Each structure stands twice: as C-alpha cells, then as structure tokens.
Design a protein with these regions (language model features):
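Phosphate-ester processing/binding pockets and catalytic centers
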Residues: 1-192
C-alpha cells in the first residue's frame, strides 16, 4: 500500500502540460510545383497548467491586436515581415514553449523506403505521431489538443493510430488527446 500511496503522491506533484498542435505545409510530392510546399512542419505550443488561463487571455489579446476578428494565421501575414516582427515581439510576454518537427520532403523523396508515406492519410498520421510520441515521452502528464484535420472518420482513425503506435504505457504517465477546430480555439491558432 505504501508503494501505491507514493505513486499517487508523485502523480500529484507532476505538473500537467497542454500541447496545442497545428501543421504548416501541405501533403504532396510534386515539390517542383510552386504551389506545393517543400517542407511539412508540425508545431506544438506547450503550456503548463498553472499558466493556461493567462496564456489563453494573452493569446486572445494578441489575436485582437494583430488579427482583429480573424484567426491567428501565418498565411494572413504573408510577406509583410514588419507585421510578422510586431507579432513576434508581442509573443515575448506569453508563457509557453515551442516544439516543432520540420520535415524536408526532398529528403523523404530521396529515401522513400516507406511506401505508405506517399498516401495522404498515412503521411499525416505518421508525421503527427512523431510529434505526439516525443511529447508523451517528454511529459508524464500531457493533454494534446490538435487542430481538426479531415472529416470525423479520419480523426477517429487518427486517434486509433496514435493509441496503437504509442510506446509502452508508463506507470506514472497520463496522456490525453483530442481535436478542436482552430477557428474556435486561439490556443491552437498560436501554433500556426
């Protein structure tokens, strides 16, 4: 019983973190086409639970200041580098960390030994699972909230994929995963 009590006590001391994820770059292998991205990036904005409320309030203030009624989206800034620098400067006071995985699709093409990656759904699942696996390894108590991708059926299959490809569960681990629409969640917009 002492061991179980110590386990519970330890779990209470471990701080929960939240990771809000979004992707940049699209699926597609015709990278010579200027409309097809050469890289695929998945970013997680990581926030400690005690900072979550302040993070959300400050992110919403940043959204209102720089994007008015729209979403925080890098594509809305485009090539306006002065505006991008103003947004980045205002990120300074917001409590969060960043974890990103950047995939050079040229390297994937050169090493296309995993034939399944040529299919869109498989590609998205595989790439997102890399991020999710690393986050679960780094944080014992984590809630991952990803931007919705595809339809409901795809998101359900993605959740099953993540669950079936996770490492062996650890006694102290507590990982949760869900999808939210970034249009309704400024926290996910911050990952854009």
């Amino acid at each position: 019983l002492q061991f179980l009590y110590n386990m519970h006590e330890r779990n209470e001391l471990v701080e929960r973190v939240y990771a809000f994820t979004d992707e940049s770059g699209a699926f597609g292998w015709d990278i010579e086409n200027p409309n097809v991205s050469t890289h695929f990036i998945i970013t997680a904005i990581i926030v400690k639970e005690p900072d979550l409320e302040g993070f959300t309030q400050k992110a919403e203030a940043l959204r209102k200041k720089h994007f008015q009624t729209g979403e925080i989206k890098s594509s809305n800034i485009g090539g306006n580098h002065a505006r991008r620098l103003r947004v980045l400067a205002d990120l300074q006071g917001i409590p969060f960390s960043i974890f990103s995985v950047c995939v050079d699709k040229k390297k994937c093409i050169e090493n296309m030994s995993m034939k399944g990656l040529q299919y869109k759904k498989t590609f998205y699942k595989f790439m997102n699972n890399i991020v999710h696996r690393e986050l679960r390894r780094a944080f014992e108590k984590i809630t991952i909230v990803a931007d919705e991708i595809g339809g409901n059926e795809y998101m359900q299959s993605f959740c099953q994929y993540v669950t079936s490809h996770q490492d062996m569960p650890n006694l102290f681990g507590d990982a949760k995963f869900s999808f939210e629409n970034s249009k309704n969640d400024v926290r996910i917009q911050m990952a854009d």
